[in-house]
């Protein structure tokens, strides 16, 4: 989905300290996406959630304007979540399958956040 022709060799990461661990985390996450047969639209929704959620609590202070901005961001995040559920329903998943898939996708976000934090170290 991100770069279908990109091939990474785990051994290439050995030249940089900590890179092998990042390769392994990236491989585990991308394998999970493949196993779940993640669709392009779902991937876009997940990327949007990550981008919108990354700064909601850290960059906005407690002024009235920032509280309004936080509320707006939360409404957009709710719409993205609704879109994910709609995509799953459109794919023919039962309600139980939709709930399970949504939970699985949202759980992956914590792994992506962890990888991001590791990359920043």
UniProtKB/Swiss-Prot annotation:
InterPro entries: NHR-like_dom_sf, Nucl_hrmn_rcpt_lig-bd, Nuclear_hormone_rcpt_NR3, Nuclear_hrmn_rcpt
Molecular function per GO: sequence-specific DNA binding; steroid binding; zinc ion binding
GO cellular component, one term: nucleoplasm
Keyword check for Zinc: yes
PTM statement from Swiss-Prot or TrEMBL: Ubiquitinated; regulated by LATS1 via DCAF1 it leads to ESR1 proteasomal degradation. Deubiquitinated by OTUB1. Ubiquitinated by STUB1/CHIP; in the CA1 hippocampal region following loss of endogenous circulating estradiol (17-beta-estradiol/E2). Ubiquitinated by UBR5, leading to its degradation: UBR5 specifically recognizes and binds ligand-bound ESR1 when it is not associated with coactivators (NCOAs). In presence of NCOAs, the UBR5-degron is not accessible, preventing its ubiquitination and degradation.
Region forming the signal peptide: none
Keywords attached to this entry: Activator, Cell membrane, Cytoplasm, DNA-binding, Golgi apparatus, Lipid-binding, Lipoprotein, Membrane, Metal-binding, Nucleus, Palmitate, Receptor, Steroid-binding, Transcription, Transcription regulation, Ubl conjugation, Zinc, Zinc-finger
Any single GO BP term: positive regulation of nitric oxide biosynthetic process
Residue ranges occupied by any NR LBD domain in the UniProt entry: 1-121
SUPFAM superfamilies, sorted: Nuclear receptor ligand-binding domain
Compartment(s) where it occurs, according to its Swiss-Prot or TrEMBL record: Nucleus; Cytoplasm; Golgi apparatus; Cell membrane
Covalent lipidation (S-palmitoyl cysteine), chain numbering: 45
Keyword Transferase: no
Protein role: Nuclear hormone receptor. The steroid hormones and their receptors are involved in the regulation of eukaryotic gene expression and affect cellular proliferation and differentiation in target tissues. Ligand-dependent nuclear transactivation involves either direct homodimer binding to a palindromic estrogen response element (ERE) sequence or association with other DNA-binding transcription factors, such as AP-1/c-Jun, c-Fos, ATF-2, Sp1 and Sp3, to mediate ERE-independent signaling.
PANTHER family: KNIRPS-RELATED PROTEIN-RELATED
Domain notes: Composed of three domains: a modulating N-terminal domain, a DNA-binding domain and a C-terminal ligand-binding domain. The modulating domain, also known as A/B or AF-1 domain has a ligand-independent transactivation function. The C-terminus contains a ligand-dependent transactivation domain, also known as E/F or AF-2 domain which overlaps with the ligand binding domain. AF-1 and AF-2 activate transcription independently and synergistically and act in a promoter- and cell-specific manner.
Subunit structure: Binds DNA as a homodimer. Can form a heterodimer with ESR2. Interacts with coactivator NCOA5. Interacts with NCOA7; the interaction is ligand-inducible. Interacts with AKAP13, CUEDC2, HEXIM1, KDM5A, MAP1S, PELP1, SMARD1, and UBE1C. Interacts with MUC1; the interaction is stimulated by 7 beta-estradiol (E2) and enhances ERS1-mediated transcription. Interacts with DNTTIP2, and UIMC1. Interacts with KMT2D/MLL2. Interacts with ATAD2; the interaction is enhanced by estradiol. Interacts with KIF18A and LDB1. Interacts with RLIM (via its C-terminus). Interacts with MACROD1.
Family assignment from sequence similarity: Belongs to the nuclear hormone receptor family. NR3 subfamily.
Name this polypeptide is given: Estrogen receptor
Annotated organism of origin: Macaca mulatta (Rhesus macaque)
């Amino acid at each position: 989905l991100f770069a279908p022709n990109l091939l990474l060799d785990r051994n290439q990461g050995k030249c940089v300290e900590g890179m092998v661990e990042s390769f392994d985390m990236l491989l585990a996450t991308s394998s999970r996406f493949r196993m779940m047969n993640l669709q392009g639209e779902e991937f876009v929704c997940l990327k949007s959630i990550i981008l919108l959620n990354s700064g909601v609590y850290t960059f906005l202070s407690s002024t009235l304007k920032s509280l309004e901005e936080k509320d707006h961001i939360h409404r957009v995040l709710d719409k993205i979540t609704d879109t994910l559920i709609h995509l799953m329903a459109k794919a023919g998943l039962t309600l139980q399958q939709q709930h399970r898939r949504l939970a699985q996708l949202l759980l992956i976000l914590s792994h992506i956040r962890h990888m991001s934090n590791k990359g920043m170290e």
